Design a protein with these regions (language model features):
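A short beta-strand-to-loop transition that corresponds to the Sensor-1 phosphate-sensing loop
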Residues: 376
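Bacterial N-terminal signal peptides that target proteins for export
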Residues: 1-7
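Bacterial signal peptide processing site
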Residues: 19-21
Length: 548
């Protein structure tokens, strides 16, 4: 299963400004079509030539998600908002090491090479496709698309034999189908000073909050061969050099990332603009769940920071249950350890799987244990200050902020008061939003060029970096860090009338090609974008007892 970067960088031609009586879109422009979602796996198989069973020269990269012990206690912990140390997690909820070693031995016995190191949530296993097919009782087939791309896949549900089934019930990596996307950029975009002003981040920065002592961790699938673009960006905007703050993590077991496409640069430049002294740690992997799960698992195990910014996703209904469940088991551990995890909700509006498919969300943003970040279009007044936002939705190029109803996950307790008619009691996304429209996007430097980028992958590091500033303030005041953000965010949204000023810019106009923005929470923009200074004050109140 492929994972897609959710960045929208498009070649644009700047036109004359089109003004309403009071406001203009930031840098209005006409744009070339944004790349559409790749076909679902089932559609790709129908279009592809069947090459027969994957043979012994085809290597598969499997990740088995380990089941936490004491499930009732673990569920109570996640629901309480409390956190545990890595050592306490291993002692109370981690898998039984002896049972895991039995499972590793069983996998090795069929001709795969399996490894596990505590406190990992994953058994990694590589080897010939026929060996994996035999172990899991599935047929793994090879295919070739019309463009010559080859991939392996199975549409069958795996059956895990004992002793594997004693410690895991899920596996990812049974296909390597992926849809890579290419991008270009155009001049313009919001400068860092605009972002600080529009989202009321400037008062936090003026108070000395710059991310010092915070670390943002980023799973990425497109490479960063050098720091040239980052160095130019920092120099242009008077920001600290990236070098002392940036760590790049690679491992052969995580596969090879794709060539640079702008996603990694976008994430890092936006995060650095908001929290310029926060450390940044990138975990590179190949763009499939088998490899990506391993990198994410190591990210959680390393626990180098308390914030994750993830701008990746796939069509939720098309994501195999094994891949979803392995990822979810890793994310459960992240929540228990107190990590905040922001995930882009997608750039195809309510149609993450394509306009020829039913509305659907983007996984993993649909997980109830992450904060899903949707998209807006920003408008400024004629005086150049923040005026309003609309839900991002462009029928011309069929793009917009991801949002809608999960097919698989029930609505969590924190969202019970926001359930809307189409939900049928299911999780709804996004939770929050920020500027994502490429026509009103962010100034970046990529490939040596000044350019403008959008997508919910731009809004996601903006949220992550803002929380880094809030965490810094909380720690200075002797309070706990944000951790899993959603209970607090929903408390703020539901009590916004009592919080003055309000912590959100409530977006009440526009749509994401299906769902309309409205007062309060909605499936186009969640609670809206942040007023960072007001949100910092609200978070302090929440943790001190106003809602915690």
């Amino acid at each position: 299963m492929r994972i897609r970067p959710l960045v929208a960088l498009a070649v644009l031609i700047v036109l004359s400004a089109c003004q309403s009586p009071r406001a203009t879109a930031v840098h209005p422009a006409a744009q070339a079509p944004i790349p559409k979602p790749p076909p679902t796996l089932a559609t790709a198989i129908l279009r592809a030539a069947h090459l027969g069973p994957a043979d012994w020269t085809t290597t598969v990269f499997l990740s088995f998600g380990l089941t936490a012990r004491n499930q009732d206690q673990f569920a109570a912990l996640l629901g309480s908002g409390r956190t545990v140390s890595p050592a306490e997690y291993a002692a109370r909820f981690g898998p039984d090491p002896l049972l895991v070693q039995d499972a590793v031995s069983a996998v090795n016995a069929v001709g795969l090479k399996a490894t596990w190191q505590p406190p990992s949530s994953v058994i990694a296993a590589d080897g010939p496709a026929p060996a994996a097919a035999s172990l899991l009782h599935v047929d793994i087939e090879s295919y070739r698309l019309p463009d010559g791309t080859t991939f392996y896949a199975t549409l069958e549900q795996p059956h895990l034999p004992p002793p594997l089934s004693a410690v895991t019930s899920n596996v990812s990596g049974l296909d390597d189908y992926r849809g890579a996307r290419g991008y270009a950029v155009r001049p313009g975009g919001l400068w860092p000073v605009d972002v600080l002003s529009f989202y009321d981040i400037k008062p936090l920065r003026d108070a000395g909050l710059d991310g010092t002592g915070q670390t943002i961790m980023l799973p990425e699938i497109d490479d960063l061969p050098n720091l040239n673009d980052l160095d130019k960006f920092a120099a242009k905007f008077g920001l600290p050099a990236f070098g002392p703050l940036l760590t790049l993590k690679r491992d052969p077991n995580w596969g090879t990332p794709e060539k640079p496409q702008g996603e990694t640069v976008l994430d890092l430049e936006i995060a650095h603009s908001v929290a310029p002294n926060a450390k940044l740690v990138v975990y590179f992997s190949a763009p499939d769940f088998g490899h990506g799960d391993r990198a994410l698992d190591q990210l959680v195990t390393d626990h180098l920071g308390s914030i994750i910014s993830e701008s990746l996703g796939s069509c939720e209904p098309d994501t195999p249950s094994g891949a979803r469940n392995v990822y979810a088991s890793i994310q459960d551990r992240a929540i228990a350890l107190g990590l905040s995890h922001f995930v882009a909700s997608g750039d195809s509006g309510a149609y993450t799987c394509g306009l020829d498919q039913a509305p659907a969300g983007s996984f993993p943003s649909t997980l109830p244990t992450v904060t899903a970040v949707g998209g807006t279009s920003v408008f400024e007044s004629q005086q150049g200050i923040y005026y309003k936002e609309y839900a991002w939705g462009s029928p011309i190029d069929q793009s917009g902020g991801g949002g809608g109803v999960s097919h698989f996950y029930a609505a969590p307790a924190y969202q019970k008061n926001e359930l809307q008619a189409p939900s049928h009691g299911q999780r709804q996304v996004p939770d929050v939003a920020a500027d994502s429209d490429p026509s009103t996007g962010f100034h970046i430097i990529f490939g040596g060029q000044d350019g403008q980028a959008g997508g919910t992958s731009a809004a996601t590091p903006l949220w992550a970096a803002t929380v880094a500033l809030i965490n810094q303030d909380l720690k200075q005041k002797g309070l706990r860090e944000v951790g899993f953000a959603n209970p607090a965010l929903y408390w703020m949204g539901e009590n916004s009338a009592k919080l003055n000023p309000a912590p959100f810019h409530d977006v009440v106009a526009g749509n994401n090609l299906y769902f309309n923005a409205a007062a309060g929470w909605d499936s186009a923009t969640g609670w809206g974008s942040m007023d960072a200074a007001a949100m910092d004050a609200a978070w302090i109140r929440y943790i001190k007892g106003g809602g915690a």
